[in-house]
UniProtKB/Swiss-Prot annotation:
Cellular compartments annotated: Cell membrane; Membrane raft
InterPro entries linked to this entry: FloA (IPR022853)
Stated family: Belongs to the flotillin-like FloA family.
Subunit structure and binding partners: Homooligomerizes.
GO cellular component annotations of the record: membrane raft; plasma membrane
UniProt keyword Nucleotide-binding present: no
Keywords for this protein: Cell membrane, Membrane, Transmembrane, Transmembrane helix
Chief place of localization: membrane
Pfam families linked: FloA (PF12127)
Primary gene name: floA
High-level lineage: Bacteria, Bacillati, Bacillota, Bacilli, Bacillales
Function description: Found in functional membrane microdomains (FMM) that may be equivalent to eukaryotic membrane rafts. FMMs are highly dynamic and increase in number as cells age. Flotillins are thought to be important factors in membrane fluidity.
Protein name as annotated: Flotillin-like protein FloA
Species in which this protein is naturally found: Listeria monocytogenes serovar 1/2a (strain ATCC BAA-679 / EGD-e)
Length: 314
């Protein structure tokens, strides 16, 4: 009995230590103390109970305090519970602080919760970003395609990040403006000779309004000539006209063949009446026997000549 008591006490102590070190990240608490960040053991235990990963909150807080930011653990924990990226948000605040950009925690958290990369927004507001667009195709007034790829230099506007249109809207607006500008050009050679005229006209249209960016410049990266749409349409029209003409000619040919067959039928019918007419003429005495034989000789002579002529042609 004297040995059971100490064993039970030892087991309880071990269980207590296991539970304690499970609930309390002692290493993280020591790191916070050494960095002079006011985080108590009770706060860390409360995070565990609220299913918050303490390192996801305390480490960014240590980083923020070291950078000279005035943040509290409750702010970061609330942002974590709301589904925000605490580490990225703190990095954005540090970058803004060092670049002398006015950005408080509430605005940074709102940008992050809106689904935008707040750190990228801060970095882009400091160092402009270059967006390379896909190929846009415009058609000049002479019917020749001009294919253009542009590079848009933009700078993030922190004030318009939440509620402002994104990168896709900027690209779509620039594409529409490029196509419209090329369409206003009389000759495609005018665009090739002066490509800056496109970028200048496009930039004058205020395409950055209502977006999260300020457009600094729009430059032509690549330009090439596409198909001659007008020539293609002319060829298609000529082919269509030719098909119509061929159809009309085929119709006339068919009508001529039909008329020829009708005439041949009429000739055959007329030839069939000749013997009857000769018979009536002989009966009525209008044609003599000698006249009839004379006519037969003429017909035989004509047939012989036609036969000889056909043989010579062969």
């Amino acid at each position: 009995m004297t040995m059971i008591g100490p064993i039970i006490i030892a087991v309880l102590i071990i269980i207590f230590l296991i539970v304690f070190f499970t609930l309390v990240p002692v290493g993280l608490w020591i790191s916070a103390l050494s960095a002079r960040v006011p985080v108590g053991l009770g706060t860390l235990i409360g995070m565990r109970l609220r299913r918050v990963v303490p390192s996801r909150v305390v480490k960014p807080l240590i980083k923020a305090v070291k950078a000279g930011l005035d943040l509290e653990v409750n702010q970061l924990e609330s942002h974590y519970l709301a589904g925000g990226d605490v580490d990225n948000t703190v990095d954005a605040l540090i970058a803004a602080h060092r670049a002398n950009i006015e950005l408080d925690f509430s605005r940074a958290a709102a940008i992050d919760l809106a689904g935008r990369d707040v750190l990228e927004a801060v970095q882009t507001s400091v160092t402009p970003k270059v967006i390379r667009t896909p190929e846009f195709t415009g058609v000049a007034q002479n019917g020749v395609e001009v294919k253009v790829i542009t590079q848009i230099t933009v700078q993030s506007n922190i004030e318009r990040i939440v509620g402002g249109a994104g990168e896709d809207t900027v690209i779509a607006r620039v594409g529409e403006a490029v196509v419209s500008t090329v369409g206003e050009t009389r000759e495609h050679t005018d665009v090739l000779e002066n490509p800056n005229s496109i970028s200048k006209k496009v930039q004058e249209q205020g395409l950055g309004d209502g977006t999260a960016y300020t457009i600094l410049s729009i430059d032509i990266a690549e330009m090439r000539i596409g198909d001659n749409i007008k020539a293609k349409l002319d060829i298609e029209k000529a082919n269509a006209d030719m098909e119509v003409a061929q159809a009309a000619a085929s119709k006339r040919k068919a009508e001529a063949i039909a008329l020829e067959q009708e005439n041949r039928a009429a000739v055959v019918a007329a030839e069939a009446e000749v013997p009857r007419a000769l018979s009536r003429a002989l009966e009525e005495g209008n044609l003599g026997v000698m006249d009839y034989y004379k006519m037969e000789n003429v017909q035989s002579d004509t047939a012989m000549r036609e036969s000889i002529a056909h043989e010579d042609e062969k």
